Amino acid sequence: MDFMQEYEKWFHSPALSPEEHAELESIKDDPKEIESRFFGPLEFGTAGLRGTMYTGLHNMNIHVIRWATQGFADVIAAEGEEGKRRGVAICMDCRNHSMEFARAAAEVCAANGIHVRIFDSLRPTPELSFAVREYGCQAGINVPASHNPKEYNGYKVYWSDGAQLPPHHADAIAKRLEEIDIFDGVKRMDFEEAVKSGLIETMGDETDRKFMANVTAMINDRETVAKVADTFKLVYTPFHGCGYKLVPEALTALGIKHLIPVPEQMVIDGNFPTVVSPNPENPEGFYLAIDLAKKNDVDFILGTDPDSDRVGIMVRNHEGEFQPVTGNQTGVLLLDYLIGAMKRSGKMPANPVALKTIVTTEMARKVAESNGVKCFDTFTGFKFMAEKKNALEESGEGKVIFSYEESYGYMLGDYVRDKDAVTASMLLTEMAAWYDAQGMTLFDALNALYEKYGWYAEKTHNLVMPGLDGLRDMAKLMKDLRENPPTEISGVKVIVRKDYTDGSVIDCVTGAKSRMELSGSNVLRYELEDGTVILVRPSGTEPKIKVYILTQGADAAASNANLEKYGQWVAALKP
């Protein structure tokens, strides 16, 4: 694609607003900036689109939203009149322009004769997954950007099971988008006109009530919560986002009496004024929550990201300071707790199964299998876990009780097929209250699990490579690792190499080649002589290579020393 030609097309298009035209005028003498915005469209994948909000083909803006929706509408229409009648559910988060983008998507769907159910205001991502399933929709559209900085927005698409789009449908949309002109190929209908004609209807409190009835049905142990409710306290922050209403509702339904919200961060604001990045993975964002917790003698802090699909926790250690609990650790804590709680309450099904991703700690497998629960791996992303859950349950092979990935996402219950911070927040709080009744904090509980199951440690390194040069550097790094694979890492021999692109496995000791069940994802895996596993993959949503170190040792010091040692090799990868 000729980026200057594309720039000129946009610059002279009457579809642009005066503000958008002025924005393009301001970069006319900056060929590098023009190239970064117009060298090609954002890639439409199974996660949809995500990018920075600027005027340009490679950015998130109303023209790209309409164009993507036209492609999606064509795929929905291919299902016939029944698919159009079942329609699409649409949701949005707190970000700047999210409501505008969601309404624009609704207008395009309506113009294509597709019935639309759109939320009246921002809602948690899991509620969109729920709505697709609850109302029998053909598809779903969400306009969030999860935990990304304020400059970002996104466009996530779902299919009829409430999970993100399967690859063959994503490919069909991508192919269709190649044929659609971004300005002239899109159908549009006025929003209010579509409402009057019955093509668009809004969802609100009634859907909230239905969703929350399913969430609260997941409570295992109200009795223990009631025993400690007069003294148990927690601090909660939604980081200016969608969790502000339903997470407190869920905790109140659980029986929590002393929920202390962070007032500054309960304010909905797409600029996220109190944090650099609204990411519960980043401890820095919890500074207000920590101050509040110390003032109120609280041991447990809970934070959900802006679209309320991911949740992070912080706990007070024995020195009285708050420390983050990683997604890997949180998942292990919750899995171990749920197994016990479900057994105690009689809720444990026959043939229970836990799901995790290939980059998630092996400690989860140890916890599951030690307690009679099978554990299966999937690729990164809840669409793959939803797919595996559906397959296991439809075949009668197993009943999934918990699915999680290390990046702070947890899926529970049968009413959603995506990560769900509302339900997870409630069950994490139930778990914290249960341990409180045993005279333990979650810091104590985590150390008890290490003593019981082994000292595992994990670290994710993000090699950020922004811009067009970054995309090239990312591709080159993956190519170099395939063409010149390491024989040792930080002085320790690589004994097995796996490439998830084609499912190939090479035994580096014997030279034997074999195949694994999983294939079709750009991930490399190195298994080392000391039991450490290192995985390398490009992020699907951000300009960075992610490197995961999964290790264990005789104790905490030994496992942390391994993280440090292998981290030096990772740091040297960045160009």
Where are these regions (language model features)?
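An N-terminal, well-structured beta->alpha segment
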Residues: 2, 7-105, 194-195, 200-231, ...
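Gly/Ser/Thr-enriched, mixed-charge loops and adjacent short helices
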Residues: 33-42, 153-285, 291-293
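Conserved phosphate/anionic-ligand binding catalytic regions in large, soluble enzymes, centered on
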Residues: 38-58, 145-148, 234, 238-250, ...
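N-terminal small/polar loop signature for handling phosphorylated ligands or for N-terminal nucleophile
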Residues: 89-152, 257-312
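Short Gly/Thr/Asp-enriched flexible loops that form oxyanion-binding sites at enzyme active sites
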Residues: 101-109, 152-159, 309-329, 364
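Glycine-rich phosphate-binding loop plus the immediately following alpha-helix
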Residues: 158-189, 328-351, 356-365, 421, ...
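Phosphate-binding and adjacent anionic-ligand microenvironments
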Residues: 294, 298-300, 321-323, 341-537, ...
